[in-house]
Amino acid sequence: MHGTDSSSDTPGQPAPSRAELLSAHAEGSISEDTILKTARDRAVDIGVGAVTPAVGALLSMLAKLSGGKAVAEVGTGAGVSGLWLLSGMSDDGVLTTIDIEPEHLRVAKQAFTEAGIGPSRTRLISGRAQEVLTRLADDSYDLVFVDADPIDQPDYVVEGVRLLRSGGVIVVHRAALGDRAGDPAVRDAEVTAVREAARLIAEDERLTPALVPLGDGVLAAVRD
């Protein structure tokens, strides 16, 4: 109806913010195939989080831009992010993905198999990421994706940057914890760790970072 106040679509509810509208548009612009949707359903079944479609599309693009021959992932989950990363990697690229939960790795492996991804293109490692990462070679990865417990983000950033070759990209998911990291009044352990990870990236002169407001926040940085 002409002249209607559009500040709220639902009586008593605040109108969505510009950021919320942009995020909804970004998410709605991405369509996922049946394999990704099935992997996402399995993530719900086993109680593990998964990147949103828009974050997945960003990962695919960054994997392609970085060269995508060697990618490391901290936090396998149900394989949703792995599928997106592999979609942007080169045909002979190898995804090394780490998770402490064997069930996550099993479900992710099922998703990779259903997508027709050969076993030579994935390396699934069960263990604590802090320990596994120290065994990976310096300057050897095109992209490192961190999607694990926010408390440990600073450790993963330090190790992840070490792994990057020149021109490689580190990507940290849940970099804003929704809007919590940006609220000065919030100072719990998770937020403190996320802010420390962001500080480490911002103060590393080898890195050029950008914070992307998708999902729970994506902090990406390319290494000189």
From Swiss-Prot:
GO terms for molecular function: O-methyltransferase activity; S-adenosylmethionine-dependent methyltransferase activity. CDD domains: AdoMet_MTases (cd02440). Its EC number is 2.1.1.-. Substrate binds at residue 147. The keyword Transcription regulation does not apply. S-adenosyl-L-methionine binds at residues 51, 73, 75-76, 81, 99-100, 149. Residues 1-11 have a biased composition (Polar residues). Coiled coil: none annotated. It is an enzyme of class 2 (transferase). Gene3D superfamilies: Vaccinia Virus protein VP39. Keywords: Methyltransferase, S-adenosyl-L-methionine, Transferase. PROSITE patterns: SAM_OMT_I. The keyword Methyltransferase applies. It comes from the Bacteria. Residues 1-20 are annotated as: Disordered. One of its GO terms (biological process) is methylation. PANTHER family: O-METHYLTRANSFERASE RV1220C-RELATED, O-METHYLTRANSFERASE-RELATED. Belongs to the class I-like SAM-binding methyltransferase superfamily. Cation-dependent O-methyltransferase family. This is Putative O-methyltransferase MUL_4520. It comes from Mycobacterium ulcerans (strain Agy99).
